[in-house]
UniProtKB/Swiss-Prot annotation:
Designated name of the protein: Nascent polypeptide-associated complex protein
Subunit structure: Homodimer. Interacts with the ribosome. Binds ribosomal RNA.
Domain of life: Archaea
Function field: Contacts the emerging nascent chain on the ribosome.
SMART domains named among the record's database cross-references: NAC
Pfam families: NAC (PF01849), UBA_HYPK (PF19026)
Amino acid sequence: MFPGGGKFNPRMMKQMQKMMKDFGMDAEDLKAVKVTIELEDTILVFEKPKVQVMDMLGNKTYSITGKAKKVAKAEEKIEDVEVKVEVTEEDVEMVSSQCGVSKEEAKKALEEANGDLAEAILKLGN
């Protein structure tokens, strides 16, 4: 690949880098820890890869070198499930007395905060 019988010549490398710059090409090594590529049916994970990005006239090309590990992709995504929290009378009284609001307002704030006392009190305090 390199002239001179395949021996690496640092001076030749500098000349090649200068020529690349003259043609609008720039290369940079990235300090990547992990690279993940998601395919239709599997996921490729590169641990401790060598990643280089080349910029050629505004178009970036990424080169990843390393050993890839295949990981099976999950079949289905878990759907978000809305959970209704049961608000106790004690919680309603606590929020009502702390914020100086009616029990109805306190109960509504607790329901909106999914039963979180601190969040309900902060919401009513503002």
